[in-house]
Amino acid sequence: MPDPNRVLAGKKATLHNPNVSQQAKERAEDYIESHSSGQETGDYSAQAGGRDLDYEDLGDYDEDADFDNEEGLNVLGDESGFVDDPMKTGDLVEEDQLEGKNIENVRGGYKATMHNPNVSKQAKTRAQRALEEIDDETQA
């Protein structure tokens, strides 16, 4: 059973998170207003029969709340849900990105990406190209 104080803390964090939609912030604020009286001091009178009433708020979940801009792009990535890869533009691997890192660990990460069945073909292709670039740079 979730701790009501932690649920309230999460709702308060939602209010200050810049990656959360205005609609989600409004729902969090409504939740805080309706559930904070007495609970901050440890009074759990809002619970009925040991059950947490917090789950009632999930009934009006709006999937569009995760989209927070005019283009309809997910705040955590693009339309497909993938987060933009910072290595997508320009060189896949720049020397300053490798500086201070164990090159064999970097290579191992790319190799793991290529063999991971949960990774898209696009990511595997990028990993292959990055490995080729690393090999070219280390041989030069």
Swiss-Prot record:
UniProt biased composition (Basic and acidic residues): 24-33
Region: Disordered, residue numbers: 1-88, 110-140
Residue pairs linked by disulfide bridges in the UniProt entry: none
GO cellular component, one term: nucleus
Polar residues biased stretches: 34-44
Domain of life of the source: Eukaryota
Similarity remark: Belongs to the UPF0654 (con-6) family.
PANTHER family from the UniProt entry: UPF0654 PROTEIN C11D3.01C-RELATED (PTHR36576:SF1)
Protein name per its UniProtKB record: UPF0654 protein C22G7.11c
Organism of origin: Schizosaccharomyces pombe (strain 972 / ATCC 24843)
